[in-house]
Every structure is written in structure tokens, then in C-alpha cells.
Amino acid sequence: MDLLNPYYLQIVMFFIINAIMGISIYFTLASGQLSLGAAGFMSVGAYVGAILSLKADLPIVVGIIIGGLVASLVAVIIGLPTTRLRGLYLAIATLGFGEVVRVIFLNLDITNGALGLSGIPSIPQELTNLAYELDIDGLMGIDAVAWGNLMAIIILLIILVLIIAFCVRINNSRIGRAFAAIKADDHAAELMGINVVYYKMMAFIIGAFIAGIGGGLYAHITNFINPTDFSYHKVVQILLFPVFGGSNVVWGSVLGSFILTLLPEVLRFLSDYRDIIYGALLVILMAVRPDGILTESMVDKISRKLGFKKAPYIPESQVLTERFEAYKRKQEEKQG
């Protein structure tokens, strides 16, 4: 098997982009919000980045970053009314937002409507051209196209690692503790002095920015985007990454995206039965492990075995409950 086959290398690229998208929805889940707007923000980042690089002739990097910022701006506008909603109402509102965005892109001339945008500058192709310029075609027995794909994978991995590092940093900060408190009980968190709306908006905007970046990368990897790429199917797919891998830890999104990106390719030989088996495996796993494959306690045990942590794991919900009970006792003592 030729591991440098462009098809296999493209699967690796899609896995990394899927991991980024899974992390984008992880932030809203971490703050107790079931948002289904990730595909909408992804489409904003994809179209803005593609149009800027294709029609405004801006560098790919600049277009992708601006796409992420525009997605964040849209999140501010959408988030002000929707983050006050809870549960199913928030899910329906954000799902509706995604459909509205898709229909808008479907009817705009600048997006080429239903025909989609083609000829988008490709990151692998640009790096392949760079490989030719550096005269490394054939170096170590690897041709320029493979070098271009490998360099694209390295760049995507660096972006993914930076996003994961940012998530870990956030989780271990005051912001992460506020997210956990809101997820455990937003009413109790508010009584403890946490600005619930502010932190929910923050999670919403961060998630939108990451989704916008993921969309920009997707557009410049596939070289073509169409409004149907961001339909309801994409919404479900993105949600499955953290839910399947473990929605309580950032590594769950990475693991879930790896398995769910690879699984259809592994089952390809089953032809017509592939989707049935794929769906059955998802149902079985959700029944056996409703919290996903990875849990907080499991990640904590692995971290302590590797020497990254020394203190034993204590569930965040337990800590928050104890703090809230202590807070109530103090209030009762003051009133007494």
C-alpha cells in the first residue's frame, strides 16, 4: 500500500479539519449549550476565505483568518438573542441559522449560487509549486505532489495542535471553570456571581471562530465548495465527533473525528451495507458508552500515568456542588 497516495493523504487532511470542527462545537457543549450552528459558521468561513483569495487575490492565510473573524462577528449577532435560550430551543434556533446562511449562499451571485465556487486556490497545490521551486521533486524518492500534500498536512497539524493547546489553556483557567459551573447548573453559577450570558457568548464566539477557520481550510483543501456541503448532514456529522469521542474532553473531538473519518473508508469494501453497519456501530457505542469513548476520569488517569498530573481526579460537578453548598451556608449564617 502506497502511504503517499494522494487519496490517503487527503483523508488525513479531512481528519484534521474534522477534528478542528469537532473542537469548535466542543466549546459550546463545555458551557452547557447544544448549538447546531457549527456548519453555518463553517460555511461563512469557507465562503469568505474562498472569495477573498479567489476574487480579491488576497493570500490564503489572510483570507482564512478574515473568514474566522467574520464568523465570530456573525456569532455575536446571532448569539445575543440565542444564548439566552436553553436546550432544544437553542438547538432549533442555531440549526435554523445554519439553514438561513446556506440559502443565502445558494442565492448570491458572488457565491455562484447552486453551482458553487470552483478554482479556489489550493493549499496542497501551492505547496506543490513551492516544492518544484525548491527543487525537492524526487528527494528521498518522494515526488513534488506528495511533498506538497505532506507539507499541507504538517501545516494543518500545527494549526490543530495550537487550537488544542488553546483549549487546554482555557479549560485550566478561570474561564474554563466558569464554563464547567454553567454546564453543571447555570442558576447556581449565576448565584455564585458568574455572568452566565457573558461566558455563554464567549464560548459561542470562540467556537464560531474555530469553525470559520475550519471552513476556510476546508475550502482551500477541496478547491471547490457548494452550499450543499454545509447542509443538515454536515451539522449531524460535526456534532457526532465530540459526542462519539467524548464531549467532556477536548481529546474526545479528536478521537471521534479520527474514527468517524476513517470508518467509512475501512467499510468501503462492504459497498451497499456500509452505511447500515456504520449507523449500527454508532447506535451500539452510544448505548454502551453514552458519554463517548473518552471521559474526564479516563483522560486524568492517562495524564497521571504519563506524569502530566499528580493530583487525583475530582469531578467538576462535585467541586461546584460543594462550593455552592458552602455559599448557601454563608448566606444563611448572614441572614441568621
What do the PLM-derived regions correspond to, one by one?
Residues 1-336:
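Transmembrane alpha-helices and adjacent helix-loop boundaries
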